[in-house]
């Protein structure tokens, strides 16, 4: 890693865990406020909330498109509108028929897709259960693998923090919770645990000085994460230029999550493990 080294002796455990824990607490408060206000911690996309999705190819500006649909419940997202992807609130009967006629009158080649509210809520429930089930299974595997309480809790807490903080940033950046972004969060559970398990395994099951084991784990772990991050950034750029919103949103969530994971692994998890070792844990 050249001159970029990881000095575990530079900070005390309390200093290492302070920033990740503050961000985690703020994220929990933010998501809880959203849940009380809207019923969901992150704004649901059309997959979960229901609505009308329209894909069209046009040279019209964002302002022109917004003006044309001023009488309809268009959810404004300039990046999506500029890419020719429009989302409207759920409409029934004559309202949906009027919208369809209004769209085809100006954009005859547009693709129109409607998701029902009831089916969307069913998918929403299934996605939440999938996230919970995946996280619980991950926690069980970690506890079975290490069989030591504090290090296992550190890994699980780090992964939990990754998901919660990433979800908060999703809402800040206007990324909705959809089937695609839910899949990204599921992938993030696996990505985040990799470096945590590497660090914990190196520290608990290898011989040598503690600071050397930390540095060795850091060199390997940071290479793993940055190479994955580089690939995901390229994916984000390519599919943003290609206006493929689903893959763009998946890669955006992964970029946020991987950056958060580096903080949680090498500050939160490492800080807890350092405290555990200083207290005499092996």
From Swiss-Prot:
The Gene Ontology biological process annotation of the record reads: intracellular protein transmembrane transport; protein targeting
Whether Transport counts among this entry's keywords is: yes
UniProt keyword Transmembrane present: yes
One of this protein's Pfam families, by short name?
Answer: SecD_SecF_C
The places in or outside the cell where this protein is found are: Cell membrane
Query: Per the UniProt record, which residue ranges are transmembrane?
Result: 16-36, 126-146, 148-168, 169-189, 221-241, 253-273
Superkingdom to which the source organism belongs: Archaea
Query: Signal sequence span per UniProt?
Result: none
Q: Primary place of residence?
A: membrane
How this chain sits in the membrane, per its record, is: Multi-pass membrane protein
Q: Which InterPro entries match?
A: SecD/SecF_arch_bac, SecD_SecF_C, SecF_arc
- Give the UniProt keywords, A-Z: Cell membrane, Membrane, Protein transport, Translocation, Transmembrane, Transmembrane helix, Transport
Cellular component (GO) terms are:
plasma membrane
List the SUPFAM superfamilies: Multidrug efflux transporter AcrB transmembrane domain
Q: Whom does it interact with, and what assembly results?
A: Part of the protein translocation apparatus. Forms a complex with SecD.
Function text = Involved in protein export.
Q: Which family does it belong to?
A: Belongs to the SecD/SecF family. SecF subfamily.
- UniProt protein name: Protein-export membrane protein SecF
Q: Which organism does this sequence originate in?
A: Methanolacinia petrolearia (strain DSM 11571 / OCM 486 / SEBR 4847) (Methanoplanus petrolearius)
């Amino acid at each position: 890693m050249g001159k970029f080294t990881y000095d575990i002796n530079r900070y005390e455990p309390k200093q290492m865990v302070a920033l990740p824990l503050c961000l985690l607490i703020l994220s929990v408060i933010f998501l809880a406020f959203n849940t009380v206000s809207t019923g969901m911690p992150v704004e649901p996309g059309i997959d979960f909330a229901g609505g009308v999705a329209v894909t069209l190819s046009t040279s019209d500006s964002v302002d022109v498109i917004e003006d044309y649909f001023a009488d309809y419940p268009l959810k404004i997202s300039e990046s999506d509108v500029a890419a020719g992807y429009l989302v409207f609130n759920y409409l029934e009967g004559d309202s949906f028929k009027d919208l369809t006629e209004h769209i085809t009158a100006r954009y005859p080649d547009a693709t129109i897709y409607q998701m029902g509210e009831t089916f969307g809520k069913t998918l929403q429930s299934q996605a939440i259960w999938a996230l919970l089930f995946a996280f619980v299974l991950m926690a069980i595997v970690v506890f079975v693998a290490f069989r030591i309480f504090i290090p296992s809790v550190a890994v699980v807490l780090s992964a939990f923090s990754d998901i919660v903080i990433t979800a908060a940033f999703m809402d800040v950046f206007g990324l909705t919770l959809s089937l695609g972004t839910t899949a990204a969060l599921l992938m993030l559970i696996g990505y985040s645990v990799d470096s945590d398990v590497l660090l914990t395994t190196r520290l608990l099951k290898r011989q040598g000085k503690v600071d050397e084991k930390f540095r060795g784990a850091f060199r390997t772990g940071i290479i793993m994460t940055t190479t994955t991050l580089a690939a995901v950034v390229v994916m984000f750029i390519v599919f943003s230029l290609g206006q493929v919103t689903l893959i763009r949103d998946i890669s955006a969530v992964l970029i946020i999550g991987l950056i958060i994971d580096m903080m949680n692994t090498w500050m939160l998890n490492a800080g807890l493990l350092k405290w555990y070792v200083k207290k005499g844990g092996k």
